[in-house]
Amino acid sequence: MSTVNASMTVIGAGSYGTALAITLARNGHEVVLWGHDPKHIATLQHDRCNVAFLPDVPFPDSLHLESDLATALAASRNILVVVPSHVFGQVLHQIKPLMRADARIVWATKGLEAETGRLLQDVAREVLGDDIPLAVISGPTFAKELAAGLPTAISLASTDQTFSDDLQHLLHCGKSFRVYSNPDFIGVQLGGAVKNVIAIGAGMSDGIGFGANARTALITRGLTEMSRLGEALGADPATFMGMAGLGDLVLTCTDNQSRNRRFGMMLGQGMDVMGAQEKIGQVVEGYRNTKEVRELAHRFGVEMPITEEIYQVLYCGKNAREAALTLLGRSRKEERSSS
């Protein structure tokens, strides 16, 4: 690819990274999309669409494919990272020596650092230093609908007001894509991780056959767990009533486009964890997020019974129905209690 002066370089050519790149290009911006597999990038360039995940959405002319990381990063100061959470830190280490001096980083990754449960902002600061502007986007966004130009809304939080304003300008499209700024950097990140866990639980409930009442109760109590953990970390509880909290939670718990929900449904129907992951065929973020969110909750002394039971199913071999009955058998509580 010849040198491009791009408004954004997108790191990660999976379904969501591709959808965001398409959205940016459709907004009239020059965009570079980089993926780690040169063969995959060559296929995208040849087909001018992502046949595997978004087969009916052609790439705009202003979307440029690139397999050379240095070339991709030289094209723009604005870098949008869209990779699974368990490789987030690894990717930042990879791009750090190749970034422009004026680089700014935004990510659409939803999750926490593998094993440690740290927020991704802490990973980014450790790898990239304290001076680089950071931002995160999160909210109810299925890649297929976003790429198709169907109405979508997200939350955006940043450490830098100028960067936040620039990102709103780049992403916001009045016809289909609304971007709401939010000063709560912690809350916007955390919502995307916890909702993955609760979505697995909602899927389990439906897989068992518990019905709409149970699913709705689980979503509601899951939101309580999300808010409880968020407050302990210093987030604004109001954030969890917005796009990055309730919005993403409802979407992921109720629609079968969600891998986490489908994964949970298979577990509820009796499939083992490995078999369910293989059948999904893509990364199920909630599997790792469950372990990470549980670790974070223990570290801050926050009780999260739904998360705990999902962890028991995923990592300790507990039966999904047994886990559900454990939750139902808990002692009576006040609705607004801290446990």
From Swiss-Prot:
Pfam families: NAD_Gly3P_dh_C, NAD_Gly3P_dh_N. GO terms for molecular function: glycerol-3-phosphate dehydrogenase [NAD(P)+] activity; NAD binding. Disulfide bonds: none annotated. The active site is at 195 (proton acceptor). Its main location: cytoplasm. GO terms for biological process: carbohydrate metabolic process; glycerol-3-phosphate biosynthetic process; glycerol-3-phosphate catabolic process; glycerophospholipid biosynthetic process. InterPro entries: 6-PGluconate_DH-like_C_sf, 6PGD_dom2, G3P_DH_NAD-dep, G3P_DH_NAD-dep_C, G3P_DH_NAD-dep_N, NAD(P)-bd_dom_sf. Keywords: Cytoplasm, Lipid biosynthesis, Lipid metabolism, NAD, NADP, Nucleotide-binding, Oxidoreductase, Phospholipid biosynthesis, Phospholipid metabolism. SUPFAM superfamilies: 6-phosphogluconate dehydrogenase C-terminal domain-like (SSF48179), NAD(P)-binding Rossmann-fold domains (SSF51735). NADPH binds at residues 15-16, 36, 110, 143, 259, 283, 285. Sn-glycerol 3-phosphate binds at residues 110, 139, 141, 195, 248, 258-260. Belongs to the NAD-dependent glycerol-3-phosphate dehydrogenase family. PANTHER family: GLYCEROL-3-PHOSPHATE DEHYDROGENASE, GLYCEROL-3-PHOSPHATE DEHYDROGENASE [NAD(+)] 2, CHLOROPLASTIC. This is Glycerol-3-phosphate dehydrogenase [NAD(P)+]. It comes from Enterobacter sp. (strain 638). The lineage of its organism: Bacteria, Pseudomonadati, Pseudomonadota, Gammaproteobacteria, Enterobacterales.
